[in-house]
């Protein structure tokens, strides 16, 4: 084990040594860069760009470009990057992750590779976790880049399309990860290429890279729209589920919250709905509705998981107990609960476009990131993103005191000890940061401190703007700050001058299931060589301890007669906790890896569709593409109607009927003509007739209008079929894990069936486009329209408004319907005369 660790450490050391040589080259250039005037320094940017056009690479320019940025940062920001920051910049430029401890100046470090890569003119994206940090960094570091003659843009959710286009056209764009992903999806839903906002994805530097690529990796970005589905099935499924009995008709696993029909339940369903086989492909929707109705009745409880308020179902947040108005369960569960509670069933939302951060960021030509804690997830970064983690040494040695965990018998004893420790440190004037896993824990400690008369601030992820002020005060004498884990990342706690020799105390009230989050909390203290102390308080009732068998330890504490106020301080327990954390991290990594394998199936399909859409948008003339689609459609139709071996069994009449209905006009192709030909010869005369009809259609209108008509048809069909396909893939994914019970690999099945569904969708697209082109009447006022309005949805944000408005059509009145004027006559005999 020690050998392996040494080996790993040596690899990092070798990288550091190699980068140290480049740092020495940069230092050597300082004497020639320092005497330059501001204008001469700015002129270097143009010089670098010219050298790139003459064949030099960004790697060749690195030492000189870094020296220029260092000098500019000293003049503009009053900050001169240290040698270790130059190393961090080199690691980022090489497409790796720089692990730099809190307070080591990651934001300034990023300016070096950002400047160097922006010289190519292809655009650099600097990615942050929230808009407050994006604006702060764009404003502060933007001064430096603008001084050197580069343009800086900021991409916010509230911006118009034109503002976004301007932000992305800049050399450097600051943005949140959510907004980048949503813009990519929206760009692949637009109907005119002028509406796209992003350029090809060149280079991204992700701040807090572990938060975005690990913690949020499993959360998909979704653009959803209203599905045009009937609510009747929800009512029927609800009525049926009410007749079922627990254990007999369905089984429920309390641990996993998994509920499923038994054999008896399946038989009951087949009888109730008068069908032979519930698992037949044509009953996929019915099975989905029954499963969701079961979940609504068995798993979801009123006033625990949701409340009924003003005739609506409102979700209750399991972590905070707060109501989450406007949020809805997906995949029809919300509608199933509405049916259960007898309130109005609202339309199910339908996924129009979706992507995970894993797949979005893997599309960049080059990707890098920085964080204080990445080494524990090194395997994941290397395997999934092809990025190595390089631990950058600190500028000054760390002198922080990390103490062994204190373990108490009960939660009550633990919290009493935590509060006592805070009170004692507060009296000495030492600033204290208390880290909690959940918001309710922070509120409990807050109440206990209020009773003791200790003034304190609470920091959680609700207010990013206020966050900066609270963090700024957190290092002052006697300050007490309670923070949930992720809150305050990206902002430094700077110590007040009067307590520089004491340092910050960090108290953890519980171990998180990830070592990385614990390390982030520890890293808040002892920044830039300051003193500091960190201490974790645990109890046998903590979730991590409960999950990994602390019963023996609790029994031992009872036998020893230890009460609530006596902690155990044991390296053995700390090691046990750490191995439990490693197990959880391993499970989480496996889950993310599996998610990626499933998501890759949809990714490959998405890339094909988006690439074709792009080609259609940029193409001036689609006629060649459409003729190819018609040829495929005809060949499939011929093969389908002539697949029997005996000629007499061929359905030539069916083929002629199909062609007349979908592609040609009556009499264009005659049955007796086709009977004289072999199957492989039939397609040719049919296609020749199709092209003749296509030419006739061309003569009826100006060429420009015909070309636009083709685009309108292609977009309408492709977008409709693709959204239906995503929905179908969702349903397939939901039920695929059941195949494992039949000793079949669910992933392999998903890949095979997903591919078959995709092939079928392509055939359906080709057929429908051919039919519309040949049979549709062409309107004079042609306009490309969206199939359905999309809205950006990300489970970790409060939902983001879509930029587009739906096209609303007026109600159509049939000629034989009653006239809307109220005369009682039919429309054709009243207001519709002559229409």
From Swiss-Prot:
The keyword Disulfide bond does not apply. May bind 1 zinc ion per subunit. One of its GO terms (cellular component) is plasma membrane. Zn(2+) binds at residues 819, 821, 830-831. Its EC number is 7.4.2.8. GO terms for molecular function: ATP binding; metal ion binding; protein-exporting ATPase activity. Residues 788-807 are annotated as: Disordered. It is found in: Cell membrane; Cytoplasm. It comes from the Bacteria. Its cofactor is Zn(2+). Part of the Sec protein translocase complex. Interacts with the SecYEG preprotein conducting channel. Has a central role in coupling the hydrolysis of ATP to the transfer of proteins into and across the cell membrane, serving as an ATP-driven molecular motor driving the stepwise translocation of polypeptide chains across the membrane. Belongs to the SecA family. This is Protein translocase subunit SecA 1. It comes from Bacillus anthracis. The lineage of its organism: Bacteria, Bacillati, Bacillota, Bacilli, Bacillales.
């Amino acid at each position: 084990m020690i050998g392996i660790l040494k080996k790993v450490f040596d690899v990092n050391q070798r990288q550091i040594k190699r980068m140290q040589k480049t740092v020495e080259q940069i230092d050597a250039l300082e004497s020639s860069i320092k005497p330059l005037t501001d204008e001469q320094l700015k002129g270097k940017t143009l010089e670098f760009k010219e050298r790139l056009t003459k064949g030099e690479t960004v790697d060749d320019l690195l030492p000189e470009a870094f020296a220029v940025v260092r000098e500019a940062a000293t003049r503009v920001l009053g900050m001169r990057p240290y040698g270790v920051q130059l190393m961090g910049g080199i690691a980022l430029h090489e497409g790796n992750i720089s692990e730099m401890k809190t307070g080591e100046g990651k934001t300034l470090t990023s300016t070096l590779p950002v400047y160097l890569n922006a010289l190519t003119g292809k655009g650099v994206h600097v990615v942050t976790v929230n808009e407050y940090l994006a604006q702060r960094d764009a404003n502060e570091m933007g001064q430096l880049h603008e001084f050197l003659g580069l343009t800086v843009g900021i991409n916010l959710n509230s911006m118009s399309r034109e503002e976004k286009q301007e932000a992305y056209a800049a050399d450097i764009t600051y943005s949140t990860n959510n907004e980048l992903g949503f813009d990519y999806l929206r760009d692949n839903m637009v109907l005119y290429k002028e509406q796209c906002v992003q350029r090809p994805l060149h280079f991204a530097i992700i701040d807090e890279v572990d938060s975005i690529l690990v913690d949020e990796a499993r959360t998909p970005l979704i653009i959803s729209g209203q599905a045009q589905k009937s609510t009747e099935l929800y009512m029927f499924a609800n009525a049926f589920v009410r007749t079922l009995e627990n254990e007999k008709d369905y089984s429920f696993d309390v641990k996993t919250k998994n509920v499923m029909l038994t054999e008896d339940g399946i038989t009951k369903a087949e009888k109730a709905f008068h069908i032979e086989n519930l698992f037949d492909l044509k009953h996929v929707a019915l099975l989905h509705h029954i499963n969701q109705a079961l979940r609504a009745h068995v798993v979801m409880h009123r006033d625990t998981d949701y409340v009924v308020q003003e005739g609506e179902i409102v979700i209750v947040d399991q972590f905070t107990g707060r109501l989450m108005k406007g949020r809805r369960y997906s995949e029809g569960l919300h509608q199933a609960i509405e049916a259960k509670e007898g309130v109005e069933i609202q339309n199910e939302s339908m996924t129009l476009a979706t992507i995970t951060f894993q797949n979005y960021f893997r599309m960049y030509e080059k990707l890098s990131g920085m964080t204080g804690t990445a080494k524990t997830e090194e395997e994941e970064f290397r395997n999934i993103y092809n990025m190595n983690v390089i631990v950058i040494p600190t500028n000054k040695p760390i002198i922080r005191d990390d103490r062994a965990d204190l373990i108490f018998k009960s939660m009550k004893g633990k919290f009493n000890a935590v509060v006592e420790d805070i009170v004692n440190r507060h009296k000495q004037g030492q600033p204290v940061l208390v880290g909690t896993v959940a918001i309710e824990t922070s509120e409990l400690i807050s109440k206990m401190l209020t009773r003791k008369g200790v003034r304190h601030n609470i920091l959680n992820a609700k207010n990013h703007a206020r966050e900066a002020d609270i963090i700024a005060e957190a290092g002052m004498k006697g300050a007490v700050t309670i923070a949930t884990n992720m809150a305050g990342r990206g902002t430094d706690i700077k110590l007040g001058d009067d307590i520089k020799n004491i340092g910050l105390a960090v108290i953890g009230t519980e171990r998180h299931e990830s070592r990385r989050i614990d390390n982030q909390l520890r890293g808040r203290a002892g920044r830039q060589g300051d003193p500091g102390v960190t201490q974790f308080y645990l109890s046998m009732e903590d979730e991590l301890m409960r999950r990994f068998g602390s019963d023996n330890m609790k029994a031992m504490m009872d036998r020893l007669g230890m009460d609530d106020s006596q902690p155990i301080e044991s390296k053995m327990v700390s090691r046990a906790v750490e191995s439990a954390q490693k197990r959880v991290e391993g499970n989480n990594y496996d889950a993310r890896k599996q998610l990626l394998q499933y998501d890759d199936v949809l990714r490959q399909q998405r890339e094909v569709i988006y690439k074709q859409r792009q080609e259609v948008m940029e193409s001036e003339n689609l006629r060649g593409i459409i003729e190819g689609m018609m040829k495929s459609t005809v060949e499939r139709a011929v093969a389908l109607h002539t697949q029997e071996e005996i000629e007499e069994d061929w359905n030539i009449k069916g083929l002629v009927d199909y062609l007349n209905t979908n592609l040609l006009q009556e009499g264009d192709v005659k049955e007796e003509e086709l009977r004289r030909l072999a199957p492989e010869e039939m397609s040719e005369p049919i296609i020749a007739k199709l092209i003749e009809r296509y030419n006739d259609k061309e003569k009826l209108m100006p060429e420009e209008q015909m070309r636009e008509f083709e685009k309108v048809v292609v977009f309408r069909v492709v977008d409709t079929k693709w959204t239906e396909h995503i929905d179908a893939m969702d349903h397939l994914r939901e039920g695929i894990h059941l195949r494992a019970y039949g000793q079949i690999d669910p992933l392999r099945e998903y890949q095979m069936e997903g591919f078959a569904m995709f092939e079928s969708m392509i055939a359906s697209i080709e057929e429908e486009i051919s039919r519309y082109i040949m049979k549709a009447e062409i309107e004079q006022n042609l306009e490309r329209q969206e199939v359905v309005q999309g809205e950006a949805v990300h489970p970790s944000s409060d939902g983001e408004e879509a930029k587009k408005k739906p096209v609303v059509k007026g109600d159509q009145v049939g000629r034989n319907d009653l006239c809307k004027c109220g005369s009682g006559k039919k429309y054709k005999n009243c207001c519709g005369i002559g229409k």
